[in-house]
UniProtKB/Swiss-Prot annotation:
Cell compartment(s), UniProt: Cell inner membrane
Upper classification of the organism: Bacteria, Pseudomonadati, Bacteroidota, Bacteroidia, Bacteroidales
Similarity section: Belongs to the complex I 20 kDa subunit family.
Species name: Bacteroides thetaiotaomicron (strain ATCC 29148 / DSM 2079 / JCM 5827 / CCUG 10774 / NCTC 10582 / VPI-5482 / E50)
Gene, per the UniProt record: nuoB
EC number in record: 7.1.1.-
Single GO BP term: electron transport coupled proton transport
Protein name: NADH-quinone oxidoreductase subunit B
Cofactor(s) in the UniProt record: [4Fe-4S] cluster
Presence of the UniProt keyword Transcription in the record: no
Length: 197
């Protein structure tokens, strides 16, 4: 029995991440869309390097941080994917992994850490608490999702998510980085935090 249809990869949350064929087609369109061929090839090279050497800054406040530590163990080797260089300083990090509940008092600190990161920077919301507030959603002092103050690039659901879910989310971020236009701007949107309005 032969399988004729390729498996589709679920998107998180962008529709252009349907499968590898559409991603390759999008990259070809970007390279042939009247842009400089040299810059297109240079974009591919730079984005390949950036996507395979993402340095995370972990902002862990609950059980998702414990699951993130399992990624560095021998069973789940982060070095295979280029995430092994976890940073303690936001000035040396490419992405921030928000793992856990964010309270209203903690939100300005998280925003300050995000602002200290160099561009291009990425945000990964890990676990139910960071994605939507989790079991503390109705509480008066909990932020209902990190996307209220930061532009989230990838959501990793779960309470806590398994290490495989971490890797799936990180690979989605790698795919997003690979199709960005490094020379001539990135496809970013900035958010104004609710507590600063």
């Amino acid at each position: 029995m032969e399988i004729t249809k390729k498996p589709k990869i679920k998107s998180i949350p962008y529709d252009e991440f349907i499968d590898n064929e559409s991603l390759e087609k999008l990259v070809k369109e970007l390279n042939t869309g009247g842009a400089n061929v040299f810059l297109g090839v240079l974009d591919d090279l730079v984005n390949w390097g950036r996507s395979n050497s993402l340095w995370p800054l972990t902002f862990a406040t609950s059980c998702c941080g414990i699951e993130f530590m399992a990624l560095g163990a021998a069973r789940y080797d982060m070095a295979r994917f280029g995430f092994e260089v976890a940073r303690a300083s936001p000035r040396q990090a490419d992405m921030i992994m928000v793992c856990g509940t964010i309270t209203n008092k903690m939100a300005p600190v998280l925003k300050r850490l995000y602002d200290q990161m160099p561009d291009p920077k990425y945000v990964v919301a890990v676990g139910g608490c960071a994605v939507s507030g989790g079991p503390f959603k109705k509480s008066y002092h909990v932020l209902n999702g990190v996307d209220k103050i930061l532009p989230v690039d990838v959501y990793i659901p779960g309470c806590p998510p398994r290490p495989e879910a971490f890797y799936y989310g990180m690979m989605q971020l790698q795919r997003k980085v690979k199709i960005e236009k490094f020379f001539g701007g990135t496809n970013r949107k900035e958010k104004k935090p609710e507590f600063m309005k």
